[in-house]
Regions:
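Outer-membrane beta-barrel biogenesis signature
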Residues: 28-86, 91, 167-176, 346-354
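Hydrophobic, lipid-facing positions within transmembrane beta-strands of outer-membrane proteins
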Residues: 55-57, 68-70, 105-109, 153-159, ...
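Residue-level signature of outer-membrane beta-barrel architecture
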Residues: 63-65, 113, 125, 161-163, ...
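Detector for outer-membrane/organellar transmembrane beta-barrel domains
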Residues: 68-80, 198-199, 203-291, 343
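Transmembrane beta-barrel strands of outer-membrane/channel proteins
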Residues: 74-78, 123-127, 177-183, 231-235, ...
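Outer membrane beta-barrel transmembrane domains
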Residues: 85-89, 93, 244-354
């Protein structure tokens, strides 16, 4: 029989995490909110070079909305995977067939809102459809059997706090603290786990599909005409799960991002991006438990995405790109075509670039 303690433990862990999330912000308010950008610094940044555009595809914006501004961002992400990497970190020249061919699409919608000039709240939800077939059958050209499912993905809540805003007259970048809770709505609604077990790479840090997760991140951005450079590192802890009455433990996850934007036309928001992405599952857990599920020797994916961003109107922007796997270990080799649009709204009637 399944343990009756696991659900209670998960509820307690979730409640504790919410308490720590809100408590940490309260503590910052009481002790560290003296370390915030001054109004003059924010005004100086807002008046500096920063073209209105979509920005990077594969990282949440480091700088945050001004108070009272909102954006809605539909993001369409797809995956084509027919090869895989072995137990050693290797290049595409060493990739192998199998074990499965996987094709998936995953629309994601993110809504973000500026609570203050220092805090931004976000929420994201997604759908996923995937089709998977064993490699031997696929290579032989035989029909079926396919494993396929369509359903709801996971739901994320994101809180960002920016203690440092960049100075256009010095090398100082913006620095933002990133906190995310992933609720396993895919599991709650019965969506089957896709091969590999990860939510697709994309806008948010990759997490384990269908599992309660807690992410802490540190991000930065610096604008220097005609370039914008941003990046971040994120650590995700997955709560213990349960399978056939056994408590399951998977490795924690580390995501990194490094993005270069080069603007060709400021007024049109036209730029090209080079976006570097890595996802690494660890051989340890923050709670000290041994790993009994997933890639016990760890896994790594390194990808690079060329992208183009553009402006449609003074409140609507978009971007399109393709993410290519350039190295991997115990992971799928895949390409990920993707595109997004983003609509801005401001209570003053005039939107501002973050």
């Amino acid at each position: 029989m399944p343990s009756t303690h696991a659900p209670t433990g998960l509820r307690l862990l979730f409640a504790l995490s919410l308490f720590l999330l809100t408590g940490s912000m309260t503590e910052l308010s009481a002790q560290a909110f003296d370390w915030v950008p001054k109004d003059e610094e924010i005004k100086k940044y807002r008046q500096s070079w920063n073209p209105f555009s979509e920005g990077p595809l594969l990282i949440q914006s480091v700088d945050i909305h001004p108070a009272g501004q909102l954006s809605v961002r539909p993001f369409f992400f797809s995956q084509i995977s027919e090869k895989s990497y072995g137990n050693q970190l290797s290049l595409p020249t060493d990739r192998k067939d199998g074990p499965v061919h996987t094709y998936s699409i995953s629309p994601l919608v993110t809504v973000t809102y500026g609570l203050t000039n220092h805090l931004e709240l976000g929420a994201a939800t997604s759908l996923i459809s995937f089709w998977s077939k064993d490699t031997a059958s696929a290579n032989a050209g035989r029909g079926g059997p396919w494993t396929t499912d369509t359903g709801m993905g996971d739901f994320s809540l994101v809180l960002k706090y920016r203690p440092i805003v960049q100075d256009p007259e010095s090398a100082r970048p913006s620095v933002t603290l990133y906190q995310q809770i992933v609720l396993p709505t895919s599991r709650w609604t019965g969506t089957e786990r896709p091969p590999g077990g990860f939510a697709p790479l994309g806008r948010l840090p990759a997490t384990r599909f269908g599992e309660l997760g807690f992410t802490e991140g540190l991000t930065f951005r610096k604008n220097s005409n005609p370039f914008r450079i941003s990046g971040g590192i994120y650590y995700t802890y997955s709560a213990p799960g349960s399978d056939a009455g056994q408590t399951t433990y998977v490795g924690d996850t580390i995501n990194t991002r490094l993005i270069f934007e080069h603007f060709l036309d400021d007024k049109r928001g036209l730029a090209y991006n080079i976006e570097l992405v890595t996802v690494h599952t660890t051989t340890w857990r923050a709670d000290g438990h041994g790993i009994n599920r997933g890639a016990r020797s760890g896994s790594t994916v390194v990808g690079i995405e060329p992208a183009i961003q553009f402006k449609f109107t003074d409140s609507l922007v978009g971007a399109v790109g393709v993410l290519f796997t350039i190295a991997g270990q115990n992971a799928a080799d895949a390409i990920y075509p993707n595109f997004s649009i983003q609509w801005y709204w401001n209570k003053t009637g005039k939107v501002q670039m973050r």
